[in-house]
């Protein structure tokens, strides 16, 4: 799929948070997609016509970006183009949680991607504010299936192990690097990358599993370079962009169907 992505170079429209916009754009370019970064409400209809997919990230949410996201969903949905929602921090505030629910109620979201706390909060399950470090009675497999069923989406839960579900099947994806949790924007770029893969119009469940595996493998490859050069967080960020731009052979990442 990565080869096809690089041949097609899909245009991915991002309504993302201001902290990570440059990193997300560079990451998409490294993968082989073309980034478009805009949250101007007046141009949502025009951009929906020329873009191949939309990624919405609520990391720096405000009243204007809420209206922008709603307007964008309306136009992308009308054109039957894929939309990824990354409900960043939706378990942390009423505004984020309420906005996420409103966007999901549009029934235009194709993929809902987040950590355990974020996805859990959208189905009434408390997993703690940090998500990845939380302890909860409901398993990740149960949460991701429930999310997919409730909102009729492909649910993607990221963490040390990723889980992807269409409400029936669940795939787990292992591998990756601990450094992903130590840089800003890894999850935001992941959501944009999900949108780029969806634009290829392949089976969405398989596409998301493949994307998660490739992303984790690139992170693993970057970590090896960090170790070889006695680096740390900063060098990982640059090696990760390099790894995304190179051919990615799945060696460390494993996709497994859960029963």
From Swiss-Prot:
Record's signal peptide: none
Catalysed reaction equations from the record: 5-(2-hydroxyethyl)-4-methylthiazole + ATP = 4-methyl-5-(2-phosphooxyethyl)-thiazole + ADP + H(+)
Any one of the GO BP annotations: thiamine diphosphate biosynthetic process
Cysteines engaged in disulfide bonds, as pairs: none
Domain of life: Bacteria
Pathway named in the protein's UniProt entry: Cofactor biosynthesis; thiamine diphosphate biosynthesis; 4-methyl-5-(2-phosphoethyl)-thiazole from 5-(2-hydroxyethyl)-4-methylthiazole: step 1/1
CDD domains for this protein: THZ_kinase (cd01170)
GO molecular function, one term: ATP binding
Annotated binding of ATP, by residue: 113, 158
Chain residues that bind substrate: 37, 185
The keyword ATP-binding is annotated on this UniProt entry: yes
One Pfam family, short name: HK
UniProt entry keywords in alphabetical sequence: ATP-binding, Kinase, Magnesium, Metal-binding, Nucleotide-binding, Thiamine biosynthesis, Transferase
Cofactor(s), by name: Mg(2+)
Protein EC: 2.7.1.50
Function as written in the Swiss-Prot or TrEMBL entry: Catalyzes the phosphorylation of the hydroxyl group of 4-methyl-5-beta-hydroxyethylthiazole (THZ).
Family, as annotated: Belongs to the Thz kinase family.
NCBIfam families assigned to the protein according to its UniProt record, in alphabetical order: PRK09355.1 (NF006830), thiM (TIGR00694)
Name the record gives this protein: Hydroxyethylthiazole kinase
Species of origin: Helicobacter pylori (strain Shi470)
Gene for this chain: thiM
């Amino acid at each position: 799929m990565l080869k096809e992505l690089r041949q097609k170079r899909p245009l991915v429209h991002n309504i993302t948070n201001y902290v990570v916009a440059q990193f997300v754009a560079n990451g998409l370019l490294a993968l082989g997609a073309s980034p478009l970064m805009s949250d101007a409400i007046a141009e949502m209809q025009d951009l929906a016509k020329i873009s191949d997919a939309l990624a919405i990230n609520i990391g720096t949410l405000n009243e204007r970006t809420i209206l922008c996201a709603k307007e964008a969903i309306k136009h992308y949905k009308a054109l039957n183009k894929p939309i990824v929602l990354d409900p960043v921090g939706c378990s942390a505030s009423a505004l984020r949680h309420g906005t996420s629910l409103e966007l999901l109620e549009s029934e235009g979201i194709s993929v809902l991607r987040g950590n355990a706390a974020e996805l859990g909060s959208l189905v009434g399950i408390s997993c703690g504010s940090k998500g990845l470090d939380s302890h909860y009675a409901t398993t990740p497999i149960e949460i991701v299936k429930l999310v997919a069923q409730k909102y009729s989406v492909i649910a993607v839960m990221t963490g040390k192990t990723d889980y992807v579900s269409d409400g029936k099947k669940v795939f787990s994806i292992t591998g990756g690097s601990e450094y992903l949790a130590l840089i800003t924007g890894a999850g935001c770029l992941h959501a944009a990358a999900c949108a780029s893969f969806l634009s290829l119009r392949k089976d969405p469940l398989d596409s998301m599993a493949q994307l998660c595996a490739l992303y984790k493998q690139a992170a693993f490859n970057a970590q090896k370079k960090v170790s070889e050069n006695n680096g740390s967080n900063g060098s990982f960020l640059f090696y990760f962009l390099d790894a995304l731009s190179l051919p990615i052979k799945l060696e460390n990442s494993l996709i497994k169907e859960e029963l």
